Regions:
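Short, strongly hydrophobic transmembrane alpha-helices
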Residues: 1-15
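Short hydrophobic beta-strand that contains or immediately precedes a catalytic carboxylate
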Residues: 90-93, 119-121
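A structural signal for short, well-ordered beta-strand segments and their strand-loop junctions
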Residues: 65-69, 120, 229
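Alpha-helical transmembrane helix bundles of large polytopic membrane transport and channel proteins
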Residues: 81-85, 90, 100-113
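Peri-transmembrane interface segments
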Residues: 210-250
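Basic-flanked hydrophobic alpha-helices used for secretion and membrane insertion
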Residues: 76-78, 104, 111-112, 117-226
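Membrane-proximal extracellular/periplasmic loop immediately following the first transmembrane helix
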Residues: 15-92
Length: 250
């Protein structure tokens, strides 16, 4: 009876953690890309995933879901003012199906032709700014809350057009190391500024319930795929479960 009651209490305690979109107990995610070959380096090979390759990946026993990261097909320049310093750089945008997001972002939608673009950035960008760029430039560190209120100037050029937009940071991601915009924006903007034609996904995100399965490594090596994600959360999950087991056993 003690074990049963302990298990019920443990379930109640971890339920809020499991239900969070960035929970380490909701499966593991790998971002896959193809190894860059000599042909890719000189522009003679394709680094994208074909529809047949995506279908084969979905059929693997260790795969729950597969989502393609869709890249922007045009040039992007971003600018922002911080501490009296104006910063400008080239950017890249990608989109991913909403079910793969680990952020509950308000206003994560886009109406075609709107000048406002909601953006999700990697959380480590905040750390890079606070502990790398800011000290070297004599700029103040900023909190995540302030970071979310930063407004970016976005200039998009392509297909003979140049237009200005405003980027709003609406969330910070622990899962995806890319600058994310809504899928609706990528599709609309690629149609307006892109070169035309369907672009193959150069990266895909895979949800798996067996992140340390040797079959995954063997499959990736055999196909020439590389996994970009780390597995820090696997260690956290193992530690948590050890504590839970120890508590119930006692």
């Amino acid at each position: 009876m003690t074990v049963v009651l302990g298990a019920l209490q443990a379930y109640r305690d971890i339920r809020p953690i499991v239900d969070r979109p960035d929970s380490f107990l909701r499966g593991d995610y790998l971002v896959l890309s193809k190894r860059v070959s000599a042909l890719n380096a000189i522009g003679l090979g394709s680094g994208g995933f074909t529809s047949e390759e995506l279908q084969e990946l979905r059929s693997q026993p260790f795969v729950r879901e597969v989502g393609a990261l869709t890249p922007a097909d045009y040039r992007i320049t971003g600018s922002v003012g911080m501490g009296g310093v104006n910063l400008s750089t080239y950017l890249f945008f990608e989109s991913v199906p909403d079910r793969f997001l680990d952020v509950e972002a308000a206003d994560w939608d886009y109406e075609p032709s709107s000048r406002d673009i909601p953006i999700i950035i990697p959380r480590n960008y905040v750390n890079l700014y606070n502990y790398g760029f800011a000290p070297s430039q004599g700029l103040p560190q900023i909190s995540e809350g302030i970071f979310r209120r930063v407004s970016l100037g976005i200039d998009i050029a392509g297909n003979g057009l140049t237009e200005h937009f405003r980027g709003r940071i609406v969330g910070l991601s622990n899962r995806l190391n890319t600058i994310l915009v809504p899928d609706a924006f990528i599709r609309w903007s690629n149609g307006r500024f892109g070169q035309g034609g369907e672009k193959q996904a150069s990266r895909v995100i895979v949800e798996t319930d067996r992140p340390v399965d040797a079959a995954i490594s063997a499959y990736l090596d055999g196909k020439g795929y590389e996994a970009e994600g780390d597995r820090r959360d696997s260690g956290k999950a193992a530690y948590f479960l050890q504590l839970a087991a120890g508590g119930l056993g006692g």
